[in-house]
Amino acid sequence: MSETGSVKFTCDRVVVELSRFAGFDELNEFRRKLLRLGTIGIDTNGVGFGNLSVRNGATSHFYITGSGTGKLPELMPADCARVVAYDFARNWLQCEGVTVASSESLTHAAVYESDPSTCAVIHCHDIKLWTALLHKVPTTPEKVEYGTPEMAYAVRGLFDNTDVLKKKIFVMAGHAGGVVAFGRDLRSAFAQLTKERMNEEGREELRIKNTPRWDRGG
């Protein structure tokens, strides 16, 4: 199982044991935070969701959580894969590691390719936040499915045609709950995600406050 379903790309994997890499501790730190929030993990069918990645800004290679790791409370380097090459047109990816790279690897690649200053990407699932942000922040088309070359091209399109580089967050209209935040590191990507969640909580409190008591139910 992948983190959000089946891996849809062709994957050429070189099976090697990955050693601890730069950014690994930070990846685990913010993954734990996301686990506590319930925005990554496994659903009631045992299928995992959500993924994180980090890269060295000097290279196009990046490390990403492996497919099927949503159930794990803590990761080891072996639970990640190193993406070393990809081709959107061929729906192809090459990675290194003992696990297959996340099904959303091409989406992460599209973000990195579009903005050289980005060194971390978080793809999480938060249906409440997704609903609040849908078409209010840069949004990929509803007909575009996750983990496909079309999604990678759609993400590149957001960078070309919207202010996503300023907002540092976008949602996937065709992938219910799918929210992606990015930044110079995982701390800044997580901060952007947290800011949007807090904004939504504030809007929800205001809606409740402005709803007449007789219309609140209960």
Could you describe each region identified by the protein language model?
Residues M1-G218:
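Glycine-rich flexible loops
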